[in-house]
Amino acid sequence: MTYKDLRNFIKTLEYQGELKKIDFPVDPNLEITEIAHRTLKSQGPALLFTNPIGHSIPILCNLFGTISRIELGIGIKNILSLRDIGKLLAFLKEPQIPTGFRDFLSKIPNFRQILNMPIKHVSNAVCQENIWNNAQDIDITQMPIMKSWPGDISIAITWGITITQGFTNKRQNLGIYRHQVLSKNKIIIRWLAHRGGALDFQEWYTHSSEKKFPIAIALGADPATLIGAAIPIPNTLSEYAFSGLLRGSKTAVTKCISSNLYVPAYSEIILEGYINRDDIAVEGPFGDHTGYYNSTEKFPVCTITHITHRNNPIYHSTYTGRPPDEPSILGMAMNELFIPIIQKQFPEIIDFYLPPEGCSYRLAIVTIKKQFLGHAKKIIFGVWSCLNQFMYTKFILVCDDDINARDWKDVIWAISTRMDPARDIIIAENTPIDYLDFSSPISGLGSKMGIDATNKWPGETQRTWGKPIQMNNSIQSRINDIWDQLHIPCNEKPFKHKN
């Protein structure tokens, strides 16, 4: 099942016991963050605060706080199904002409899914049931915008989908960026230089003679569009198209009142506005996904000129902090999308994992089917340059395919027994680094480490390599057969050695 809007999804969550309505008065200033954080850590439900102190609009939090709710939101039974969409993205990134009739037939499912990529235009959209366009009526602080952490400089919009379009690019880009609230009609948009919105703005700034860069921000879109906007995909592909792939149907959009941008038609709230060419301000500090307050930095200021919303709108929000948080849960799920794209370039990769403790992308664990001397080092350099977001990955660890990349016990065993620090570590200096990473000596520039934790072949070592201990299969089977008769008090299932 897929959902045309957020409200349908909320009804399903409530029916399945995955959403809790909270009528008790709670303050958007810090209190909701603490409640949502405790709930998320215990894998609890989504939360709908119906009585936020000082506001009449309810707040929805913790929407994608579990893998099961992400699966439900895009209508899949298992998160591994996202690899099928990843395969389609890999196909779109490097399409191949069918080599024959059989090959053509095998590609038909791809072509069918592609039919869901174009947008569907909707007139009289519900997101424009109420329109505020007089300057004196524009007041975004009427929304119950949260202050997440004690050291945050102000309240901030966290789940707004920012829609932009470059000067020459026909596709419209969707991205999730933090919006610091400056006043009733002004916000700061914090986007990193490599993200689609920033690239669109830079292209417009360079080539356009206009003074105002149009912006739209959608709050409370349908789950597929929310997830689609949160995932970094190739810049040539619109997130509207990607959302259609996730949903299995075209994304419904409607034209903005003040510009030619299109917004999700069933959104709860829409903010329309513009960025003046040289209007910038210092953003932050805010608590971030790293678990620290980020440093201050200058970013563009957006002036809001129009607010539209549904009748009785819902404000969708979240907090970011040290994992686990909602972005890290989403990152774990969306990890599956990248695997087919990476495997298309490096078929020898068996698994690719971004642990949530690595703050989304700072540490990657890769397992490979090793085929030649120095193979791990090839993969390390390849991953750093494979996709844009991986240029910020500080640590890449490569293991053999007998290691479970998602089991720290396995990974640490490989590091401890298969790696020599002097021989098997690569240090790359003066490389691009996330400016939020205060551990780097210069903002935006730092070092990276690649670790080869694979078994070493002759030529990579002069010593006889160790042979892993392994029990005979016949003995394992025998003990499995008699295990229950032994009556050993043990919560774990009988351990089975890897073949």
UniProtKB/Swiss-Prot annotation:
Per UniProt, the cofactor note for this protein states: Binds 1 prenylated FMN per subunit.
Gene3D superfamilies attached to this UniProt entry:
Single helix bin (1.20.5.570), UbiD C-terminal domain-like (3.40.1670.10)
Report the pathway entry: Cofactor biosynthesis; ubiquinone biosynthesis
Q: Which GO terms describe its biological process?
A: ubiquinone biosynthetic process
SUPFAM superfamilies found in the cross-reference section: FMN-binding split barrel, UbiD C-terminal domain-like
What EC class is this? lyase
Molecular function terms, GO-annotated: 3-octaprenyl-4-hydroxybenzoate carboxy-lyase activity; metal ion binding
Q: Where, in this chain's numbering, is Mn(2+) bound?
A: 173, 239
Active-site residues from the entry: 288 (proton donor)
List the subcellular locations: Cell membrane
How is this protein situated with respect to the membrane?
Peripheral membrane protein
Query: Which positions are annotated as binding prenylated FMN?
Result: 176-178, 190-192, 195-196
**Gene Ontology cellular component list:** cytosol; plasma membrane
State the needed cofactors, names only.
Answer: prenylated FMN; Mn(2+)
Catalyzed reactions: a 4-hydroxy-3-(all-trans-polyprenyl)benzoate + H(+) = a 2-(all-trans-polyprenyl)phenol + CO2
Pfam families this protein is in?
A: UbiD (PF01977), UbiD_C (PF20696), UbiD_N (PF20695)
* InterPro entries listed in its UniProt record: UbiD (IPR002830), UbiD-like_C (IPR049381), UbiD-like_N (IPR049383), UbiD_bacteria (IPR023677), UbiD_Rift_dom (IPR048304)
**What EC designation does it have?**
4.1.1.98
Family in the record: Belongs to the UbiD family.
Q: Report quaternary structure and partners.
A: Homohexamer.
Q: Which HAMAP family match?
A: UbiD (MF_01636)
Q: How is this protein named in the record?
A: 3-octaprenyl-4-hydroxybenzoate carboxy-lyase
The protein's organism comes out as Blochmanniella floridana
Gene that this sequence comes from: ubiD
